[in-house]
Design a protein with these regions (language model features):
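Conserved NTP-binding catalytic cores of kinases and kinase-like/nucleotidyltransferase enzymes
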Residues: 1-84, 205, 316-319
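Active-site acidic catalytic loop and adjacent metal/ATP-binding pocket
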Residues: 34-42, 49-50, 82, 175-222
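ATP-binding pocket architecture of kinase catalytic cores
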Residues: 43-137
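A glycine-centered beta->alpha junction motif in the catalytic cores
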Residues: 99-112, 153-156, 276-291
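A cross-family kinase active-site recognition segment
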Residues: 112-165, 187
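Active-site activation/catalytic loop segments of kinase-like enzymes and analogous catalytic loops
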Residues: 221-255, 270-287
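All-alpha amphipathic helical-bundle segments outside canonical DNA-binding/catalytic cores
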Residues: 257-269
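ATP/Mg2+ or Mg2+-diphosphate-binding catalytic cores
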Residues: 276-319
């Protein structure tokens, strides 16, 4: 989340005329993140999040994300709920951009990850996967392995600046991943971006999953592999077998992994590490950021990709 589009109280009051509210109490920009403009707003003594969509221009995509949140909320998954306006729509417009008002969730992201946290993350991810089976909308994964080759070609100079001959190394690694990529695993809607900054904790329990704007259809185990890359490496980029085991324990208590999912987890982890390496390189020095925006270092995912290259089976992770 970030602030790209500046709005005033008067702008927001005009936006809120299409809602059944009375008083606008405050408006405060949120600087974290890189995708959308976000404000915390107080209305009628309650807190909300106003999201202004910067990079997502297709209203069908926005509607998919918002309907997914409505579906998950109705199935007791802790996530923001879009507020419908007087026209019974979740999408409005402010400063000529698609926007949505979402309920505010209490809690904070954690910076020091412990086994108890990843156990809760595993359970939360499994709960989400179990509750999307009857969600009727679909969205293909625009950042699946079919698109990684284009990102490698597009960012050749950046990759070789990051590390000598990295462009050719990643082309070779992508071929390895493609050869091993599974054809048929349990699948459905995944979060696809469940990093620590997208999970809120309150009293050491998950109080909310946020930022569903990469959600799409893909393998459930691929979603789990993203969590492994996001949660199971410490600040020195060292893999923690204990954190890994607690993540899988929480997940499998609610949704046991199939033998095929376990067998393919190493290549899925390689794939998700490559995906985030490439998108971080693509975002690296390539945006005209307006305010304070947290661009992320691609090097940490290069290190994680190299780690997964050495993994031969699930036991090598310490399971």
């Amino acid at each position: 989340m970030a602030v790209f589009t500046h709005i005033t109280k008067e702008d927001l009051k005009d936006f809120l005329k299409n809602y059944s509210f009375n008083n606008l109490d405050f408006i405060k920009g949120i600087n974290e993140g890189i995708q959308n403009t976000n404000y915390k707003v107080g209305i009628d003594s309650n807190d909300y999040i106003l999201t202004i969509y910067e990079n997502i221009t297709d209203t069908n995509d926005i509607n998919f994300f918002l309907e997914l949140m409505i579906h998950l909320s109705s199935n007791n998954i802790k996530c923001p709920t879009p507020v419908k306006n007087l026209e019974n729509k979740s999408i409005g417009r402010i400063k000529s951009k698609s926007s949505a008002l979402l309920t505010f969730l209490e809690g904070k992201s954690i910076s020091s990850i412990e086994e108890s946290h990843t156990y809760e993350i595993g359970k939360a991810l499994a709960e989400m996967h179990l509750n999307v089976t009857n969600f009727k909308l679909e969205k293909k994964n625009d950042l699946s392995y079919n698109g990684w080759s284009d990102l490698i070609e597009l960012n050749q100079k950046k990759l070789n600046f990051l590390e000598e001959n990295l462009y050719n190394k990643l082309k070779k690694e992508l071929n390895r991943i493609r050869d091993l990529w599974p054809k048929d695993l349990p699948s459905g809607i995944i979060h696809a971006d469940l990093f620590p900054d997208n999970v809120l904790f309150l009293n050491n329990k998950v109080s909310g999953l946020i930022d569903f704007y990469f959600s799409c259809n893909d393998f459930f185990a691929y979603d789990l592999s993203i969590c492994i890359n996001a949660w199971c490496f410490n600040k020195e980029n060292k893999f923690s077998k204990e954190i890994f085991r607690s993540l899988l324990k929480g997940y499998q208590e609610l949704k046991p992994l199939t033998d095929s999912e376990l067998e393919n987890l190493p290549v899925l982890c390689s794939g998700s590490a490559l995906r985030f390496l490439l998108t971080r390189v693509d975002n690296w020095n390539s945006s005209n950021e307006v305010d304070i925006v947290n661009y992320q270092d691609p090097k940490e995912f290069l290190s994680r990709l190299k780690f997964h290259e050495q993994i031969n089976n699930i036991e090598d992770y310490g399971l």
